[in-house]
Every structure is written in C-alpha cells, then in structure tokens.
Amino acid sequence: TKENNSLYVVDLKTKSISGVYPLGGEGYTCALSPTKPELYVSCWGGGKLLVFNTMQKQFTDTIKVGSHPNDIEITANGNFLFVANANDNTVSVIDLNKKRVIEILNTALYRNSLYGSTLNSLALSTDQKTLYIANADNNSLSIYDVGKPGFSSSEGFIPTGWYPTSVAIVGNKILVANGKGFSSLANPYGPNPARKDGESIYQKSDTT
C-alpha cells in the first residue's frame, strides 16, 4: 500500500493479514515470478525494485532503477523484468538471475528531450520480442524490440488518444486505455513532426 509504505501478505484461507513488510518508500505495484518463489515490488517513492522471497517471507534484494518506477512486466521465462520510470522517460531492463539493471531504454520522442513523457504502462507481445510502452504525456506508445535483452532497439511510436494509461496485448491486437479521451490533446505547442531532433520547450507559471 502507498498509505503506509508497506507490503501486506494475506492468508486467503483465514482471510487475515499474515505479515506486514516495510518498503522504505511508496509502493506502486507488484508481480510474481512465473518460475521462482519471488515477488517484485516497484517502489514508487524510492527509485528501486524490491525482491521479496515468498518462501522465506523477507526481502532479499534491492535493485536501483529510475525515478518514480511504476508498472512492471516480466518475461514468460522469468529471466527478465521491465519497469517503467515515469519521471525520467526510461524503462529499466533487469536481469532477474543477476539481480541488476542491464539496459536502460529511452522512450522520449527525441533523444535529448526533457523529462515529461510520463511512462505508466508496459505490455509484451505474445512472442515476447516487442515491448509496448504507454507514454501518457506524449499521447503515444513507444515500441522496442527486446528480443535480446541488453541489445534492444527502438521501433518507433504509435499515436494514441489523450493520455494513454494502460496498454495490453490480446492476440495480434494492441488495446490502449486513454485516460482523458480520444483526441490527442492538450499540448498547445505540439506534438510537431517538423520540430528538430532534440529541440525542447517549457512553459513558466506563477503559483503565488
């Protein structure tokens, strides 16, 4: 839970809490390994991924990732994990056998873009070779060939509706939930296909 920065373990037979484990920061989501007795927890407020051994009932590893990690996607063989880092336009690729980041994917529209893509959802293709990344504030999906983790390559972008918040793969179809509607709004300055690579803009405001 985010409210008290803890992982709760619930006994489904007795419908009671069997353990509470501090995360050291706000948790976002968790996912079970398909092959190991491990649970992976993205620590939203800590810039880290925690590894919880479900047999030993304790955290066994902490893996440093990017800023504001949220959604998690694990390969079917349980060897690799992808975590979306909302605050710095990146996805951390983690080798779950070595428990370390082996690659960082940049999902911004331009190589030198300022932070602000706001990644918030991941989905792997059925063949496990393509990763789809929801860039909420870019109104797009970023696509990466991840067939060989550690040597991934960008495949480009797919335009979406306004503020994509979730992406899922069903067969050969990509389903995207648009949090604010169907039109790609509300950036008055773009996206602009003619903008030069690396050109960025910002707006000032007065909060007083």
Task: Describe every region a protein language model picked out.
Residues 1-208:
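Predominantly soluble domains enriched in secretory-pathway, periplasmic, or organellar proteins
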